[in-house]
Regions:
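ATP-binding Walker
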Residues: 14
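Conserved phosphate-donor/acceptor-positioning beta-strand/loop module used by diverse small-molecule
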Residues: 97-102, 112-136
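Pre-Walker A (Motif I) flank of P-loop NTPase domains
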Residues: 2-6
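ATP-dependent small-molecule kinase phosphotransfer cores
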Residues: 37-97, 104-107
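Walker A/P-loop
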Residues: 17
Length: 189
C-alpha cells in the first residue's frame, strides 16, 4: 500500500457523485479514480473522464488478465471495475484516491485496501426519494429505474455493518459538513 483512499458507495441515485465532486473541489490532493464499465456512455459522458468505456468482451479479457483491483457484473453484461493501472497512476502523483463505486465494489475495495481506506455508505432518506431522484435525473428508462429501485433495497441490506461510516443524504449542506469532518479526521489519523 502506498497512500490513503476514500471509498464512496451508494445505490444509484443516492447522491454520491454530488458529494464526491464537492470534496474534489475542496481538496486539490484528492483525485477521482475513474472506473471502467461495459455500459454505453450517458449523455455527454466521455471515455477517460467519467469512465473508461470498455465493451463486455474486452472487460472479460481484462478480468482474465487480473487487471482489476475489483470488478462486478452489476447487471447482465454490465460490468464495473477498478483497474490496477488507475490506482498506480494516482498514487504515482502522491494523491489520495477517491472511489465512487457500487456497494459490492465498496466492500471489496475496503477489503483490498484495509486500514488505508475509509469507506462511506451514502444512504437516501427513503426508497421513495431515491426513485424520485432517478426519475428527475432523466437519464434512464422507466424499466431501468424500476430495476435500480428494486436493487437498492438488497444493496442497503447487504451493506449493513460493512462500511466505516453511513451518511444519510437528506439535507445536502448538512451532508457536506458531516463528510468534511469525517474526511478531515481520517486524513489526520
Amino acid at each position: 500500500m502506498e497512500g490513503k483512499v476514500i471509498i464512496f458507495s451508494a445505490p444509484s441515485g443516492a447522491g454520491k457523485s454530488t458529494i464526491v465532486n464537492h470534496l474534489l473541489g475542496l481538496h486539490p490532493e484528492f483525485e477521482f479514480s475513474i472506473s471502467a464499465t461495459s455500459r454505453p456512455p450517458r449523455g455527454t459522458e466521455k471515455d477517460g473522464v467519467e469512465y473508461y468505456f470498455i465493451d463486455a468482451d474486452r472487460f472479460r479479457r481484462l478480468i482474465a488478465e487480473d487487471a482489476f483491483v475489483e470488478h462486478e457484473e452489476v447487471y447482465e453484461d454490465r460490468f464495473y471495475g477498478t483497474l490496477k493501472s488507475e490506482v498506480e497512476r494516482i498514487w504515482a502523483k502522491g494523491n489520495v484516491i477517491i472511489f465512487d463505486v457500487d456497494v459490492k465494489g465498496g466492500v471489496n475495495l475496503k477489503k483490498y485496501f484495509g486500514s488505508s481506506a475509509m469507506s462511506v455508505l451514502i444512504v437516501p432518506p427513503s426508497i421513495e426519494e431515491l426513485e424520485r431522484r432517478l426519475v428527475n435525473r432523466g437519464t434512464d428508462s422507466p424499466e431501468a429505474i424500476a430495476e435500480r429501485v428494486a436493487k437498492a433495497g438488497s444493496e442497503l441490506e447487504f451493506a449493513k455493518g460493512r462500511f466505516d461510516f453511513e451518511l444519510v443524504n437528506d439535507d445536502l449542506q448538512k451532508a457536506f459538513e458531516e463528510i468534511e469532518a469525517k474526511v478531515d479526521g481520517f486524513l489526520c489519523a
